[in-house]
């Protein structure tokens, strides 16, 4: 995964092209990309393993497993795709919003616009989407209630 720190756009490419990253593809900056990886970009979790972990945790003390069960539930709800992950705090900072939009509200807005959007089960406060940075900006400008703009 590569990210343009100037405009925020994210992109990915296969390991076979690792040395051949181009500059940012957006119209406004053509900046060099900050590259992370190589990274695994598929789902991290097996639902069968998570189901078994949840079953095993039922025999343990809730004081030990409360946070673990919450994590298992988050991982089960996270399909692991799309690969690009965003923070509502980053959106608020990048787009000069008064405050970060609630995660569930923003996911609902993205879905209403036809995008895939899910909570990131690995990183709390982040969401996964196939929307580009320009599309995220448009949703922020056109769909967020006035209290956030």
Q: PLM features: what roles do these ranges have?
A:
Residues 1-149:
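SAM-dependent transferase fold signal centered on methyltransferase-like domains
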């Amino acid at each position: 995964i590569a990210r343009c720190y100037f405009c925020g756009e994210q992109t990915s490419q296969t390991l076979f092209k690792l040395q051949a990253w181009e500059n940012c593809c957006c119209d406004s900056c053509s900046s060099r990309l900050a590259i992370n990886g190589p990274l695994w970009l598929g789902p991290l979790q097996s639902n069968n393993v998570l189901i078994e972990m949840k079953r095993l945790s039922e025999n343990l003390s809730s004081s030990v497993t409360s946070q673990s069960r919450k994590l298992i539930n988050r991982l089960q709800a996270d399909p692991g795709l799309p690969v690009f992950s965003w923070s509502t705090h980053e959106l608020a900072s990048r787009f000069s919003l008064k405050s970060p939009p609630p995660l569930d509200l923003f996911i609902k807005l993205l879905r209403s616009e036809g995008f895939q959007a899910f909570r990131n089960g690995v990183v709390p406060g982040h969401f996964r989407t196939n929307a580009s940075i320009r599309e995220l900006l448009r949703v922020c400008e056109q769909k967020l209630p006035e209290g956030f703009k």
